[in-house]
Each structure stands twice: as structure tokens, then as C-alpha cells.
């Protein structure tokens, strides 16, 4: 069955394979183009450097008109990531546009690591530490980075 969503996902996949953004990879599961796994590496020269985070992306037949559901599979401590791994990011919600492809989604999530929005917290403890106690926030992020190596 060849739908517009599946054709678009194949195009996104080919583009991701031929011109991958730095620190990002992703691919559909073997038997389901609507389910993807991705890896985001922590940006260099940041407290996230060296991290390897796994994510899942679930697309509907309405993609690219509807945003995918994206979750961290790796443990995460970040102001904009819920306990279940869901991500509070405007382009995955009210600012979604069909112009975003998978590379843009993953790049935006990678950027969010270093540039959180503590005013729209999904994790209130992380947001509070980010605003009020950067040293403790950085310590907890370092723990998550180290845990990401074995997850």
C-alpha cells in the first residue's frame, strides 16, 4: 500500500541517509515505515557532549499533515521532557508544519537539549534546577549522559 505518508517517509529516509545532520541518525523499523528509531548525540562543547540518546518516532497515515509522536527511550533529565519520554516542543504540537521533515525534527530536539524552555516545563524539578541551581542541574545532566552510554 503506497500512501502519501509512506512516500514522504521514504523520501525523508533517503534524505537522512544521503545528507545526515551532525549527531543524528534514524531509520524505520524493518517491517513498519510508520515506526522509527533514532539516535541523537549530545552536542559538542555542551554539558550533553558524549551522550547517546535513543528515541522512537511514530507516524500516522496523515503525515506530514500531522506531527509524529516522538519520545525519548533513554532516561532523560530535561525541563521539556516528561517522565514517559514525551517531548514538549512547539514544532511537535501547535507549531507543526508539513515542511518539517525527520531531519528537522531530530535537529530541533538536539537543539532543545542545550536551549531548554523552563517556562513551559514538562519536568518541574529539572526546570527549577535549571533556573535556580545550575550546578545541581549540570550534575544531574552529567549522570544522565553517563547512563546514556549503557542504555
From Swiss-Prot:
- Reactions this protein catalyses: S-ubiquitinyl-[E1 ubiquitin-activating enzyme]-L-cysteine + [E2 ubiquitin-conjugating enzyme]-L-cysteine = [E1 ubiquitin-activating enzyme]-L-cysteine + S-ubiquitinyl-[E2 ubiquitin-conjugating enzyme]-L-cysteine
Spell out the InterPro entries in the cross-references.
Ub_conjugating_enzyme (IPR050113), UBQ-conjugat_E2_core (IPR000608), UBQ-conjugating_AS (IPR023313), UBQ-conjugating_enzyme/RWD (IPR016135)
Keyword entries, A-Z: ATP-binding, Nucleotide-binding, Transferase, Ubl conjugation pathway
Q: Which family does it belong to?
A: Belongs to the ubiquitin-conjugating enzyme family.
Source taxonomy lineage?
Answer: Eukaryota, Amoebozoa, Evosea, Eumycetozoa, Dictyostelia
- Indicate the enzyme's highest-level EC class: transferase
Record-given protein name: Ubiquitin-conjugating enzyme E2 2
Spell out the Gene3D superfamilies in the cross-references: Ubiquitin Conjugating Enzyme (3.10.110.10)
Q: Does the keyword Signal apply?
A: no
- List, alphabetically, the GO terms of the cellular component aspect: HULC complex
Q: Which PANTHER family match?
A: UBIQUITIN-CONJUGATING ENZYME E2
Q: Which domain of life is it from?
A: Eukaryota
Q: Which GO terms describe its biological process?
A: DNA repair; proteasome-mediated ubiquitin-dependent protein catabolic process; protein polyubiquitination
Q: Which organism is it from?
A: Dictyostelium discoideum (Social amoeba)
The UBC core domain is annotated at 4-150
Amino acid at each position: 500500500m503506497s500512501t502519501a505518508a509512506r512516500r514522504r517517509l521514504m523520501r525523508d529516509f533517503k534524505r537522512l541517509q544521503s545528507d545526515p545532520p551532525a549527531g543524528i541518525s534514524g531509520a524505520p523499523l524493518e517491517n513498519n515505515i510508520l515506526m522509527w528509531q533514532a539516535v541523537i548525540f549530545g552536542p559538542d562543547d555542551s554539558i550533553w557532549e558524549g551522550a547517546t540518546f535513543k528515541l522512537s518516532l511514530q507516524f500516522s497515515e496523515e503525515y506530514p499533515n500531522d506531527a509524529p509522536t516522538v519520545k525519548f527511550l533513554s532516561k532523560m533529565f530535561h525541563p521539556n521532557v516528561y517522565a514517559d519520554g514525551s517531548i514538549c516542543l512547539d514544532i511537535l504540537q501547535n507549531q507543526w508544519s508539513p515542511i518539517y521533515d525527520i531531519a528537522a525534527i531530530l535537529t530541533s530536539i538536539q537543539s532543545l537539549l542545550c536551549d531548554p524552555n523552563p517556562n513551559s516545563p514538562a519536568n518541574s524539578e529539572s526546570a527549577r534546577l535549571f533556573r535556580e541551581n545550575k550546578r545541581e542541574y549540570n550534575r544531574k545532566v552529567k549522570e544522565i549522559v553517563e547512563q546514556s552510554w549503557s542504555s
